[in-house]
């Protein structure tokens, strides 16, 4: 029996090793077969064989054993695209109870798609809408759906929760109908006339409506208040503010509020983390390379990351030929004679000396100054002024370059025949390329020289328009260089006066468009109004004159009235400028209005304006431009002084009539 059992075992193992064991399928249940003919030892052998046989992996072979027509494919849950668009976002923790109802109403009743909820509570810095803000963003299906959705949502909030929402960008029902009706009427008129309607923004919609529900009081809300201190003014309001942003699909993709307000931990990924790690490693490497290799300190050095130094934009930017030291702390030798305070005092002393020289130049009359400037740029010692200036410069290249540049600017401003604007531009390029700094006063003098009309003898090689473009571009480049050096020139009246003079210079070309120049003058006035400059001093009076010469009458009288408000009263010089500029402008209607209104106002000033030679000549020229005749001219101002001055005005008018 033992030999038979071993033979059966060997046959079974050999059969198992030759072919893989297959699991058979039966339609009848397994039967427990019992035979009385077999002995107990045979059952033991079968049991032993059953335990020794390898157990197949049913999970691995189930797909192979089951025929293809009996295999059941796994169920793949697919969501419809429309259902995905209409999913309601999850409500954050500690949100007001009204939040879930608002989301359901926006999705089911209003019909907004792709809704996103942004929890902006606890943000630092705070959003512009407040500290505790929950923002809901949704897309409407069109412009009409956008307006209807916002209107119905506001009405639902008022009727259901007694809230007072504010919808920014929403037009009322009647207002929207009126605007649409007017737009359709304009389109019909344009089509009947054979033209196309204006496609500019009609103000009907911007594709974006912001519904500010307001603060929703909820005692369950945990306020994330900052400890110590407060922000803003007034009492601290509790509750959470809910804001619903409704967009059209195009406007939502353009604005992309989700990217703006999403927390950084949600938008960062492995790539951004990798970039931050690389940037930090690069910063550490640069920090180690900038640390000195040896030091004499007894304490160990530490690599403490420090933020980069902040640049003060109010400081001037200077050029330097010295290489920047890599070490943070620079050791100054005890034997060094270099002292920054002494250098600063020396530079200030040089500027004071230069300003004293040019004050002397400004004290001379134009004819005397033209004579003192010599024959041209090569003349350095024919006059006393040139000898003093170049002897002061000495061998200092900076001082010599500055003096040459400023003397050329003064000569061009006086229309000296030996100096040209091209030579002045060449000197300016040499000055800036050498790294020499110009003060604000010097830069304005140079730019003003470029805007002075040229002599006729210098206008032969190029056309007038080309010369005008060169002059304006050169002046603006000088101002650009001054702004790059750190000067805050935007608050200076002289900058805008330069722009006005550039416009006047552009009108020197006969082909120039006066309407275009007037439009640019209006833009300059708008910029000055936005900045809020004070109308005081000589620069403000120059701005006033330039505005009237460019046809900006409203801008002229804006400064004229502001002068009386800021300074208390107008002087005889102000009235002389008033009448003289109206005469130079050449507009008869404006000149007549000026004479009718402001001659009588001179007697109401405190003190009253008395006649002198300058104002008498200005009134006569203004009356002549206004079209009045000397025989019929009468002053509306009744005073003994002005009655005596009337014959002088009439005589001046007759002289002008004879000259014409």
From Swiss-Prot:
The yes or no answer to whether the keyword Membrane is present is yes
Presequence extent in this chain? 1-32
Give the compositionally biased regions (Polar residues): 287-302
Q: Which GO terms describe its biological process?
A: mitochondrial gene expression; mRNA stabilization
Q: What is its main location?
A: mitochondrion
> According to the UniProt record, which cysteines are disulfide-bonded?
none
**GO CC list:** mitochondrial inner membrane
Q: Which UniProt keywords apply?
A: Membrane, Mitochondrion, Mitochondrion inner membrane, Transit peptide
Transmembrane ranges? none
Where in the cell? Mitochondrion inner membrane
**Residues annotated as region Disordered?**
287-313
Entry keyword Zinc: no
Topology versus the membrane: Peripheral membrane protein
Query: Which protein family is it in?
Result: Belongs to the ATP25 family.
In terms of PANTHER family, this protein maps to: ATPASE SYNTHESIS PROTEIN 25, MITOCHONDRIAL
- Function of the protein: Probable mitochondrial mRNA stabilization factor.
In its UniProt entry, what is this protein called? ATPase synthesis protein 25, mitochondrial
Its gene name is: atp25
């Amino acid at each position: 029996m033992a030999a038979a059992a071993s033979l059966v075992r060997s046959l079974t193992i050999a059969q198992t090793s030759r072919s893989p064991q297959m699991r058979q399928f039966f339609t009848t249940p397994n039967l427990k077969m019992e035979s009385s003919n077999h002995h107990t030892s045979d059952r033991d052998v079968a049991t032993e064989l059953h335990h020794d046989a390898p157990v197949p992996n049913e999970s691995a072979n189930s797909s192979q054993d089951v025929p293809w027509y009996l295999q059941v494919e796994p169920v793949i849950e697919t969501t419809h695209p429309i259902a995905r668009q209409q999913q309601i976002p999850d409500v954050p923790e500690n949100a007001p109870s009204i939040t879930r109802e608002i989301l359901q109403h926006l999705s089911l009743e209003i019909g907004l798609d792709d809704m996103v909820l942004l929890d902006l509570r606890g943000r630092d810095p705070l959003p512009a809408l407040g500290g505790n803000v929950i923002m809901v963003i949704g897309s409407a299906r069109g412009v009409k759906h956008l307006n209807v959705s916002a209107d119905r949502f506001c009405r639902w909030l008022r009727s259901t929760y007694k809230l007072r929402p504010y919808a920014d960008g929403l037009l009322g029902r009647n207002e929207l109908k009126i605007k649409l009706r007017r737009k359709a009427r304009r389109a019909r008129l344009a089509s009947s006339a054979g033209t196309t309607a204006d496609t500019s923004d009609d103000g009907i919609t911007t594709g974006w409506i912001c519904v500010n529900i307001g603060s929703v009081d909820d005692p369950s809300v945990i306020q994330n208040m900052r400890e110590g201190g407060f922000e803003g003014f007034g009492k601290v309001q509790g509750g959470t503010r809910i804001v619903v942003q409704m967009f059209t699909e195009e406007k939502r993709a353009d604005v992309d509020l989700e990217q703006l307000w999403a927390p950084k931990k949600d938008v960062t990924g492995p790539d951004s983390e990798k970039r931050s790690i690389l940037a930090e490693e690069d910063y550490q490497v640069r920090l180690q390379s900038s640390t000195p290799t040896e030091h004499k300190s007894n304490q160990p050095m530490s690599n403490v990351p420090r933020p980069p130094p902040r640049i003060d934009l109010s400081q001037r930017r200077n050029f330097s030929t010295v290489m920047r030291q890599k070490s943070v702390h620079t050791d100054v030798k005890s034997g060094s004679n270099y002292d920054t305070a002494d250098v600063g005092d020396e530079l200030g002393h040089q500027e004071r000396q230069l300003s004293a020289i040019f004050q002397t130049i400004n004290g001379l009359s134009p004819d005397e100054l033209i004579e003192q400037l010599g024959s041209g740029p090569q003349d350095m010692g024919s006059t006393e002024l040139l000898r003093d200036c170049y002897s002061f410069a000495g061998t200092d290249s900076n001082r010599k370059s500055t003096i040459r540049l400023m003397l050329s600017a003064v000569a061009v401003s006086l229309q000296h025949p030996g100096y040209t604007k091209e030579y002045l531009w060449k000197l300016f390029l040499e000055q800036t390329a050498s790294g020499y700094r110009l003060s604000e006063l010097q830069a304005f003098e140079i730019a003003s020289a470029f805007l002075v009309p040229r002599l006729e003898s210098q206008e032969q090689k190029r056309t007038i328009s080309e010369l005008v473009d060169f002059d304006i571009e050169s002046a603006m480049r000088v101002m650009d260089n001054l702004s790059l050096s750190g000067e805050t020139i935007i608050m200076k009246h002289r900058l805008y006066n330069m722009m006005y003079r550039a416009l006047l210079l552009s009108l020197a070309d006969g082909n120039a468009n006066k309407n275009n120049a007037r439009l640019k003058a209006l833009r300059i006035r708008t910029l000055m109004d936005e900045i809020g400059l004070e109308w005081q001093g000589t620069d403000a009076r120059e701005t006033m004159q330039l505005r009237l010469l460019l046809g900006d009458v409203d801008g002229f009288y804006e400064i004229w009235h502001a002068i009386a408000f800021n300074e208390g009263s107008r002087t005889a010089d102000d009235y002389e400028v008033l009448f003289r500029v109206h005469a130079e402008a050449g507009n008869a209607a404006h000149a007549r209005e000026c004479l009718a209104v402001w001659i009588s106002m001179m007697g109401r000033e405190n003190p009253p304006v008395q006649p002198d030679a300058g104002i008498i000549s200005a009134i006569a020229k203004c009356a002549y431009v206004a079209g009045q005749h000397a025989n019929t001219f009468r002053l509306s101002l009744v005073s003994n002084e002005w009655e005596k001055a009337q014959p002088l005005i009439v005589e001046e008018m007759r002289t002008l009539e004879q000259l014409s």
